[in-house]
Amino acid sequence: MNNSYLMGLDFGTLSGRAVIVRASDGAEMGTAVHEYPHGVMDRTLSAADGRKLPPDFALQDPADYLGTLEVIVHKAVEDAGVDPGRGLDVTSATVVAATRNGTPLCQLPEFRNEPHAWVKLWKHHGAQDQADRIVKLAQERREPWLARYGGILSSEMLMPK
């Protein structure tokens, strides 16, 4: 019998994880976990000049994602001993500012020490003032779309960030 296998990838807050399962029955064949080298930068911009960050910031280095991807894919495949298919899951509230060609701004020398050029994690709440301003203006204008969000916007959403 010819088996098919699937690989699932999850990029969490502190680490990336991979799992390989047999498609026919979901049996786990191999796994891997790798912690991000720079972790979460919530006090200082430790991957750059070390400057102190404002309250409620939660940033990451996008290079950690690529390095982690390489590690966990190879380790999971080795652990399972199979050639997998691949699937990807990411958190929609994590934002990466990038150039037209996809280069994250924090990887450009002129933006390396700019906190807003780094990946803003789902738990980055540094945009609360902007979220409040957007809601206030939407209420004043009686914007119909605001009701779809329960009359509020989270600072974790793309628009305030």
Regions found by a protein language model. Name each.
Residues 45-48, 54-161:
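Glycine-rich phosphate-binding/catalytic subdomain of phosphoryl-transfer
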